[in-house]
């Protein structure tokens, strides 16, 4: 997500996976020019009594949006129909972990200057980052998380 000079990457996982995130492009771990990039990793545990479900999250998002067309198109592409949410209610989750990282010098990532331009015949580059090696970049307190999110939302 991009808001002015603030960027926020979001990754999700289920329990049992090491703290590794998949990065879909070389530029995904670079902030906008003169800006800041945070990476938020969420771990969701399947739980029949969990507080999170697609219909509830979709409803929350729809209530916050003036125009739901884009959201409905994206959810529809995944097979979700807001008129018939019952099939999705059985998939419930509990948020069991969240970690926010400041991505910058010292964060494990590929150096874009080392691989750009890509060689002829190579059009995409995906890689994984072990967040255990980014522990020093992790924002540890709820106050730090809230400040980073507030800064992201307020920058334009």
What are these regions (language model features)?
Residues 3-7:
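Active-site beta-strand-loop-beta-strand hairpin of nuclease catalytic cores
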Residues 8-12:
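Hydrophobic/aromatic-rich core segments of domains that either
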Residues 2, 14-156:
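Nucleic-acid endonuclease domains
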């Amino acid at each position: 997500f991009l808001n002015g000079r603030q960027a926020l990457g979001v990754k999700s996982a289920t329990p049992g996976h090491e703290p590794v995130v998949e990065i879909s492009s070389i530029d995904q771990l670079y902030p906008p020019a003169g800006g800041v990039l945070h990476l938020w990793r969420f771990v969701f545990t399947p739980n029949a009594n969990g507080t999170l479900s697609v219909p509830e999250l979709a409803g929350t998002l729809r209530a916050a949006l003036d125009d739901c067309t884009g959201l409905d198109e994206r959810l529809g592409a995944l097979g979700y129909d807001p008129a018939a949410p019952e099939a999705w209610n059985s998939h419930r989750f509990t948020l069991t972990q969240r970690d926010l990282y400041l991505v910058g010098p010292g964060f494990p990532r590929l150096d874009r200057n080392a691989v750009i331009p890509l060689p002829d015949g190579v059009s995409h580059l995906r890689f994984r980052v072990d967040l255990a090696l980014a522990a020093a970049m992790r924002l540890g307190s709820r106050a730090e998380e809230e400040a980073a999110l507030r800064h992201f939302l307020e920058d334009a």
